[in-house]
Amino acid sequence: MSYSYEACFWDPNDNGVNILLGHISQGIRSCDSMILFFKQRSELEKDYARRLGAITGKLDKDIGTNMDYGKLNETFNVVLSVEKARAQSHSKQSEILFRQIYTDTKAFAANLQARYTTLSGKIERLRMDKFNKKKGCEVLQKKLQDAQIRFRDLQLNENNMIGAKRVEHNKRELLKWESNSQEYKVQLDVLKQEYKASQKFWIHEWAQLSCELQEMENARISFLQSKLQQFATSSMETYILEQTKMDMLTNHLNSFTAADEISTFSKENGTGRLKHKTSKGDMNSSANWAQMSSISTTSKKTESYMDNIRKLSSQLKETENKRKLASIDKYEKPLPSPEVTMATQFRNSTPVIRNETKVVANPTLSLRSSPVQLQSNVDDSVLRQKPDKPRPIVGEEQLKPDEDSKNPDEKGLMVHKRNQSLSSPSESSSSNPTDFSHIKKRQSMESMTTSVSSMANSIDDSQRFAKSWNSSNRKRKSMSHLQVPSSASSRSDDGGRTPNSAHNLNEDDYNTRRDTSTSTILFKPPVAVRGTSRGHTHRQSMIMQDSSNPIEDALYEMERIQSSSKPGTKTGNIMDERGVVRDRGITVTLPIVTSEGFPVIEYAKAMYPLIGNEAPGLANFHKGDYLLITEIVNKDWYKGEVYDNDRIDRNHRIGLIPYNFIQLLHQGL
């Protein structure tokens, strides 16, 4: 079904005619608004072009009087040409607006008004003719009824008259009203026929007139669309020209620096140079040479470090395969319980794995400050008999072995060369941060560390650790928890202190902590309970000796450790650190929960105001207000609360916050 003026404005009382004529008249009056807009806009563009031309002329005169030097003077000339082009563009736009848009729209609106006046007058005449004939029919019908009633009364009183004169008068009246009734009846029949004819003519004429009104409205809308499109095109041409000129100016500004200008002027207009002493020149060249050699040494160390990592990875895989295949060994040797740390640091934009061994092997650290007493019941002879235990590999990701295709002889030669390179004091401390060969009697601990590291690196983060470990262990970033014995004497002391430490530590103190910001995993194995003999193992391994799937065993053990940890003391220090942000160098303390009790995950500051928007669920705020972010909806929207602004209604103080209106604040002092 199609809708049009010709088909949708028919009714017995002609109400549709009034509605349609009012709509057409309102549209014509709206044209006057656009005519006034185009006129004022053309005057504005003309005045802007005139003023800009005057400013440009003054700038041209000043540049000619006070000339700058070099590239900056060329930049001034570029600015002058850009502004001249801008003034010409706006002058052209003013002419287009006045001559092509304003004038044409004004003439079209006048023609439209004249056409509407003609059509509306014709419609009114037709409607009036139809109305008059209808009204005449009603009047004649009433007269006919009155004449018929009078004739009937006279006819009834004809036999009741006394006297000849009265009878004669009654007859004359009877004949008169009878003739009047006949005449009214004939006139009424004729007028009814004329009224029916006027109705038919109105229907025919209204169909044509409504079609003409529809064509007139269509022409008005199309004309205004074309003129507005012409206005948009002329404005866009001006804006594109301005953008092009501004890009040219920007490129010219980026083509030189202040140092270039100073150097050029000094070169072309310099009058003499000071002679520098040779020693100072030698010193500068020596400093440059030292810097270049330092960079070369760093790159060589990085390459050496990567080679060491690859070699250790190959040794690790080979040792793991031997352990799995060796089913003869039915017991697990008791190992000390160091805390295994995997950390990553970025130094000078180069990934470097932090050497945790230096902290561990520091002789100034005593066993009294360590949170866990190290225990070992392995004698020195057993430790010396297994020198080729794999060393721990510490890092954010364990590198894949790249030497699987080599034969056993080449691998043995590589291991021998690796042991020789690690035995030198210079390489043990700086070349490979993961090497522990310079620390004596560490084979058992290194074996345990290597097995845990290899398994931990092969398990996905999302399967191993819950997100709650992030908040519970951020406060344990300090390296003061890392402390292991570094000499044979400390090992012998551990053996003597094992019973005491077993009484002081609980069996359930088996905590696993992970800090995602530094990729650190800390394992605290349980201490043997009272009554355990020295010959038994003091540490429960995360993997069973004859396990066919060590990764699943390690995963199960980690989940059990996580579920047994106490969550009550995990968020204390983290909540203390939150609420303190930096705003333009000023420390600001904000609440860590909203007024409704929701925890705050981010803090932000409003860079632009968002006021007066009555959309439901949208927060309103002023520029400079602090915002408490409680939820990140997506990359474009946050959800939160406006902090401490009573000028905003309560219904719009909490809701959605657009990301491009705010700036996130960094936490911490």
Swiss-Prot record:
Residues 381-391, 397-413 have a biased composition (Basic and acidic residues). One of its GO terms (biological process) is primary cell septum biogenesis. Throughout most of the cell cycle it forms a double ring that coincides with the septins. After the onset of mitosis, forms a ring-like structure which colocalizes with the medial actin ring. Mediates cytoskeletal rearrangements required for cytokinesis. In conjunction with the medial actin ring exhibits contraction-like action. Residues 1-261 form the F-BAR domain. Residues 134-200 form a coiled coil. It holds the Pfam family FCH. Present with 195 molecules/cell in log phase SD medium. Its main location: cytoplasm. This is Cytokinesis protein 2. The lineage of its organism: Eukaryota, Fungi, Dikarya, Ascomycota, Saccharomycotina. It is found in: Cytoplasm, Cytoskeleton; Bud neck. Residues 599-667 form the SH3 domain. SMART domains: FCH, SH3. GO terms for cellular component: cell cortex; cell division site; cellular bud neck; cellular bud neck contractile ring; cellular bud neck septin ring; cytoplasm; cytoplasmic side of plasma membrane; HICS complex. Keywords: Cell cycle, Cell division, Coiled coil, Cytoplasm, Cytoskeleton, Mitosis, Phosphoprotein, SH3 domain. The keyword Transferase does not apply. It comes from Saccharomyces cerevisiae (strain ATCC 204508 / S288c) (Baker's yeast). The modification Phosphoserine is found at S337, S366, S421. One of its GO terms (molecular function) is myosin II heavy chain binding. The keyword Cell membrane does not apply. CDD domains: SH3. Interacts with INN1. Residues 372-518 are annotated as: Disordered. Residues 421-431, 445-455 have a biased composition (Low complexity).
